Amino acid sequence: MNIKEGKFLETILAEKKQEIAQMPDENSKPIRQTYRLYDYLKKHSDQLQVIAEVKKASPSLGDINLEVDIIAQAKNYEQAGAAMISVLTDPVFFKGNIEYLREISKNVQIPTLNKDFIIDKKQINRALNAGATVILLIVACFENDFEKLEELYNYAISLGLEVLVETHNKAELDRAHQLAAKIIGVNNRNLKTFEVSLQNSTDLVPYFKEENVYISESGIFGKKEAQKVAENFNGILVGTALMQANNLTKSLTDLKIKRKNDEH
């Protein structure tokens, strides 16, 4: 599906509403047992931690790695020291599938993140039942409806899920803090234009709160970019660079930069 420039998020959300309308309403099951991401990031704050993403395609890059064996990729991420595996489940724009999350979650011991444009409780139940222990809530998806964001956040927490709350600017970061979110992402990609700049991460650092953990997302392709954010971020979310890596273990290990501000 083609997306008009500047209308990325709008187009995706319109499609997502159609997807949700067809989605069965599942009863939530008990959460899969693994460590808590927040606790892990606090405990291992001496190194920049990597959230490694299973991503076959994206609207900005097109096909990234369609032939990948998703279970082998996920197991390799786990063995290489990823803190969590992010799994894209959007079928239309990212060629993802909820079954990828289900299969990966069955085959790894570490936390899994349902990476999707979540705007409804049905999606949260589905994520939990597919083995996710963390879900993504993107503040930009709730531009004029903070109450809905808060409702979904609290609902996910009530089920035992952790929530990565994604922000892109100061106003959205304020929203995340207002929620009392503990795990906050800063997306270096503008979801309206899909342009990427690490400046997004840098600009928001002065407003960080010591009790939270912060993840820099998008635009991190190697050691150089990782070093730029390592001092102020607990972790990074990396997809394309790892999906295309010739030596996955080395590529992931290289990203785990020693951090100066060890919080122990």
Swiss-Prot record:
GO terms in the biological process aspect are: L-tryptophan biosynthetic process
Q: Which PROSITE patterns match?
A: IGPS
Per the UniProt entry, the Enzyme Commission number(s) are 4.1.1.48
Q: Which domain of life is it from?
A: Bacteria
Q: Which residues form the signal peptide?
A: none
Transmembrane annotation, as ranges: none
Which InterPro entries does UniProt cross-reference here?
Aldolase_TIM, Indole-3-glycerol_P_synth, Indole-3-glycerol_P_synth_dom, Indole-3-GlycerolPSynthase_CS, RibuloseP-bd_barrel
Gene3D superfamilies for this protein? Aldolase class I (3.20.20.70)
List the pathway annotation: Amino-acid biosynthesis; L-tryptophan biosynthesis; L-tryptophan from chorismate: step 4/5
* Pfam families named in the record: IGPS
**Catalyses which reaction(s):** 1-(2-carboxyphenylamino)-1-deoxy-D-ribulose 5-phosphate + H(+) = (1S,2R)-1-C-(indol-3-yl)glycerol 3-phosphate + CO2 + H2O
What GO molecular function annotations does the UniProt record carry, in alphabetical order? indole-3-glycerol-phosphate synthase activity; phosphoribosylanthranilate isomerase activity
* Keywords tagged on the record: Amino-acid biosynthesis, Aromatic amino acid biosynthesis, Decarboxylase, Lyase, Tryptophan biosynthesis
Q: In its keyword annotation, does this UniProt entry include Lyase?
A: yes
- Report the NCBIfam families cross-referenced here: PRK00278.1-3
The record's PANTHER family line, in alphabetical order, gives:
INDOLE-3-GLYCEROL-PHOSPHATE SYNTHASE (PTHR22854:SF2), TRYPTOPHAN BIOSYNTHESIS PROTEIN (PTHR22854)
Which HAMAP family does the record match to this protein? IGPS_B
Give the record's family classification: Belongs to the TrpC family.
The identity of this protein, by name, is: Indole-3-glycerol phosphate synthase
